Swiss-Prot record:
<protein>
    <recommendedName>
        <fullName>SPbeta prophage-derived uncharacterized protein YokK</fullName>
    </recommendedName>
</protein>
<dbReference type="InterPro" id="IPR018958">
    <property type="entry name" value="Knr4/Smi1-like_dom"/>
</dbReference>
<dbReference type="Pfam" id="PF14568">
    <property type="entry name" value="SUKH_6"/>
</dbReference>
<dbReference type="InterPro" id="IPR037883">
    <property type="entry name" value="Knr4/Smi1-like_sf"/>
</dbReference>
Length: 192
């Protein structure tokens, strides 16, 4: 599938991307691939060139209902509830040398990830969305686990498949957030 189809899918969302006209994306990608010792998939490279480090926002959000951009993974991770079929996407890392720097994210996790796995985006709770650069698969990394062979869960078989799994998900209000203050009293307090 061509990058054009990925671009079409991404038009479903508002893309908040930092613009850095002084960045030579081809040079940055060349340096990045040299650092990781492998080629990135072409659709992911095209994504980095066009959007860089970015956040996706739902176009469905209204005054009444707020939406998050989520993905539907192939394999559930420990952070998903029993009835959940989506997980939150926070933001993608990019080529600029800023807080969304892909190279900085790779460096940060180099001692926790196998050599062939790099972070490409952040997920809720300090978890990461990663790419296995040997096969292009997209994985969820659970930051609370400490067994490299068990810390990763399959999201998608390719970057393209990952992008096509993105959906708008309404943010559920807390069930107890009904404007009523609940107070629990200990029985010992009541008997004194």
């Amino acid at each position: 599938m061509s990058f054009t189809k990925i671009e079409q899918k991404l038009k479903e969302f508002t893309i908040d991307a930092g613009r850095y006209p002084s960045i030579n994306t081809n040079e940055q990608l060349k340096e990045l691939e040299m650092n990781i010792g492998n080629q990135l998939p072409s659709d992911y490279k095209d994504f980095l060139k066009k959007y860089g480090g970015c956040y996706l926002e739902s176009k469905k959000t209204t005054d009444e209902i707020e939406y998050d951009v989520c993905y539907k993974p192939l394999e559930k991770d420990p952070w998903m509830g029993k009835g959940d079929d989506t997980q939150l996407l926070e933001g993608f890392y990019g080529l600029a040398n800023d807080h969304n720097s892909l190279q900085k994210a790779i460096d940060t996790y180099s001692d926790r990830f196998p050599r062939n796995i790099i972070p490409i985006a952040s997920s809720a709770g300090g978890n990461e969305i990663c790419m296995d650069i040997d096969n292009g698969k997209i994985l969820f990394w659970d930051h609370e686990l400490s067994h490299p062979d068990k810390d990763f869960f399959l999201i998608a078989n390719s970057f393209e498949e990952f992008v096509f799994s993105l959906v708008d998900e309404p943010i559920e209000a807390d069930k107890e957030d009904d404007g009523i203050l609940y107070i629990e009293l200990d029985d010992d307090l009541l008997s004194s």
